[in-house]
C-alpha cells in the first residue's frame, strides 16, 4: 500500500512537471547564481564539533557567496553549437537581449488627481507610466513602515502589473491558448507590429494594466483606499471589439531618448496627447488569447508581442540616427549614459545593452517539448562542458529550476516512503511473531482435541491444515 501511494504520488509529480514544463524553461544567463550550492554557504570549515579550544573560527560565507556567482561567455562559437540541437526537441529558443520593451512602446495616458492637484494627459512610454504609479504609491504611503524597514519598496509594483512580454514559438502558444477574439499573430518578421491581449480563464485583466496600457482614461485620487484609487468612467466591462484594433506606438532610440540641447543631456520622450507620432511605428492588437482548460500558460495577463518585434528594435538600433546615444554610452568611462526623466527630475544610467545596442543575448530560455527533449538538450550542453573545467571561461552553467524544485520534493517523498516502509516492515515482523506465538499456544492448549482427531483417523497433515487455516484467518 505504501509503495503504491508513493508510486502514485511520483506519477502525479511527473504529470505536474509536464504541465509546468513551459513555465520553467531551461535557461542560460550571461550571469547567474548557482542555487544548488546555496546550502553550502554556512557549512562549517571546522572538522570537529564542540572543539575544546578558546578560539572563534570565521566562516568564509562571503567567499562562498562570491563563488555562487557564475558568468557565462555566450560566444558566437557556443551559440552556433547550441543551435545544432535538433529543433524537434523544443518549441522555442528565446533570446533576451537585456533591454526593456516597455521603454520603447508608447501610449496615450490620462490621469486626473485631486489630491495633490495633478493632471496628466500625455503620450509616453509604458515604463514611464509604471514609474508614475510607483511614485503614487510612495506619496500615499502604500508601503507600511515595518515592511519598508525590511527593504520592501515600490518596485514590487512592477511584479504585479503585467505589461509587455515576448511570446515564445507560435506552436507553443497555439497549444496553450484559445483565440477568443481577432486572430493569432503570424509571427512573421514583416508582421512585427502585431500584438495580442492575454486574459485569464475568467476573461479578467487588471484595471491598472488597462490604465498603464492606455485603453481608457483613469481618475486617480490620492488618499483613497487602493481598491478605490482608480475608476474608469464607471466601465467594468469592455467589449472585445473595443480592445481588438487598439493602437500603440514603437519608438526607436532617437524617438524614445531625444537629446536636449539646452540641458546637454538625453531625456525620456514625454509629449502632450495627440502629438505628432510620425516618428513612431504603429502597433496593433490583432487578437485576444485565453489559456485553455487545465493548462498552465507561459504568458501572464497583459500585452504580448512576437520575437519579430524584438528583432525590429535591434535592427533599428543599428541605424545611424539611433547610434548616437549608444555610442555615447559605449565611449563613456562608466559604460553608460544618463537619461533624464523630466517628470521626476531624476536621471537613469542607460548602458549599451539596455539601449538595445548589443546583439549578443544576455539570456537564453529553451522551451522543451517534453522531458526527454529537455534531457537531450542538457546532454548537448554537458558535451560542450566536457571539454572544459568549471573555472574556464568557456564553461557554460545552465539553470533548471523545475528540476531542482521537483528534485527536492521527490527526495522528501522518498524519505517519507522509506520511513513508512520501515514502520510497515516492523509491524509485519511483530505481527508474524505474534501469530506464531498464538499458533503455538493454540497447539499446546488443544492437545486433547488433536488426540480426538487422530483417533477419528485424521492424519498429521490434516491437523496441520486445520491450524494453518486458523493462522491464515488470524493473519
Which role does the model predict for each range below?
Residues 1, 66-72, 137-153, 344, ...:
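Solvent-exposed loop/turn and edge beta-strand elements of beta-rich ligand-binding domains
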Residues 37-247, 251-254, 258-264, 280-282, ...:
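Short beta-strand boundary microenvironments
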Residues 5, 9-13, 46-47, 154-160, ...:
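Peri-transmembrane interface segments
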Residues 2-27, 31, 35:
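Alpha-helical transmembrane segments
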Residues 4, 8, 433-438, 467:
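Transmembrane alpha-helix boundary/anchor motif
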Residues 419-430, 439-440, 448-475:
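Transmembrane alpha-helical interface segments in multi-pass membrane proteins
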Residues 267-290:
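Short beta-strand-centered aromatic/proline hotspots
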Residues 32, 201-203, 254-255, 290-293, ...:
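Helix-start (N-cap) segments at beta->loop->alpha junctions
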Amino acid at each position: 500500500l505504501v509503495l503504491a501511494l508513493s508510486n502514485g504520488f511520483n506519477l502525479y509529480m511527473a504529470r505536474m512537471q509536464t504541465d509546468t514544463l513551459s513555465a520553467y524553461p531551461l535557461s542560460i544567463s550571461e550571469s547567474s547564481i548557482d542555487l544548488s550550492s546555496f546550502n553550502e554557504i554556512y557549512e562549517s570549515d571546522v572538522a570537529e564539533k564542540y572543539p575544546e579550544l578558546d578560539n572563534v573560527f570565521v566562516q568564509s560565507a562571503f567567499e562562498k557567496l562570491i563563488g555562487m556567482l557564475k558568468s557565462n561567455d555566450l560566444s558566437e562559437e557556443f551559440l552556433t553549437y547550441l543551435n545544432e540541437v535538433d529543433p524537434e526537441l523544443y518549441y522555442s529558443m528565446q533570446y533576451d537581449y537585456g533591454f526593456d520593451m516597455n521603454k520603447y512602446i508608447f501610449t496615450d495616458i490620462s490621469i486626473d488627481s485631486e489630491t495633490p492637484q495633478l493632471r496628466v494627459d500625455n503620450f509616453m512610454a509604458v515604463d514611464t507610466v509604471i514609474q508614475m504609479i510607483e511614485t503614487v504609491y510612495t506619496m500615499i504611503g502604500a508601503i507600511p513602515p515595518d515592511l519598508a524597514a525590511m527593504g520592501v519598496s515600490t518596485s514590487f509594483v512592477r511584479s504585479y502589473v503585467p505589461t509587455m512580454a515576448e511570446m515564445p514559438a507560435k506552436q507553443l502558444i497555439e497549444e496553450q491558448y484559445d483565440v477568443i477574439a481577432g486572430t493569432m499573430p503570424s509571427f512573421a518578421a514583416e508582421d512585427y507590429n502585431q500584438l495580442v491581449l492575454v486574459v485569464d480563464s475568467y476573461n479578467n485583466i487588471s484595471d491598472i494594466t488597462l490604465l498603464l496600457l492606455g485603453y481608457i482614461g483613469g481618475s486617480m485620487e490620492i488618499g483613497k483606499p487602493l481598491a478605490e484609487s482608480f475608476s474608469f468612467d464607471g466601465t467594468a466591462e469592455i467589449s472585445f471589439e473595443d480592445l481588438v484594433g487598439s493602437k500603440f506606438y514603437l519608438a526607436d532610440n532617437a524617438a524614445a531618448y531625444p537629446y536636449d540641447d539646452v540641458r546637454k543631456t538625453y531625456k525620456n520622450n514625454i509629449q502632450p496627447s495627440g502629438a505628432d507620432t510620425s516618428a513612431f511605428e504603429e502597433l496593433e492588437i490583432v487578437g485576444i488569447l485565453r489559456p485553455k482548460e487545465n493548462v498552465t500558460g507561459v504568458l501572464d495577463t497583459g500585452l504580448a508581442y512576437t520575437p519579430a518585434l524584438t528583432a525590429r528594435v535591434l535592427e533599428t538600433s543599428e541605424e545611424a540616427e539611433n547610434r548616437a546615444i549608444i555610442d555615447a554610452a559605449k565611449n563613456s568611462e562608466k559604460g553608460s549614459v544618463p537619461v533624464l526623466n523630466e517628470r521626476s527630475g531624476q536621471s537613469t544610467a542607460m548602458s549599451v545593452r539596455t539601449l538595445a545596442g548589443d546583439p549578443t543575448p544576455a539570456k537564453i530560455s529553451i522551451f522543451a517539448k517534453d522531458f526527454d527533449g529537455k534531457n537531450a538538450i542538457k546532454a548537448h550542453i554537458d558535451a560542450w562542458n566536457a571539454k572544459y573545467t568549471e573555472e574556464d571561461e568557456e564553461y557554460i552553467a545552465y539553470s533548471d529550476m523545475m528540476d531542482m524544485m521537483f528534485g527536492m520534493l521527490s527526495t522528501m517523498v522518498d524519505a517519507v516512503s522509506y520511513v513508512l516502509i520501515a514502520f510497515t516492515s516492523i509491524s509485519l515482523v511483530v505481527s508474524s511473531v505474534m501469530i506464531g506465538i498464538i499458533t503455538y499456544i493454540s497447539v499446546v492448549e488443544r492437545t486433547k482435541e488433536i488426540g480426538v482427531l487422530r483417533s477419528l483417523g485424521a492424519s498429521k497433515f490434516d491437523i496441520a491444515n486445520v491450524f494453518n487455516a486458523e493462522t491464515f484467518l488470524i493473519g
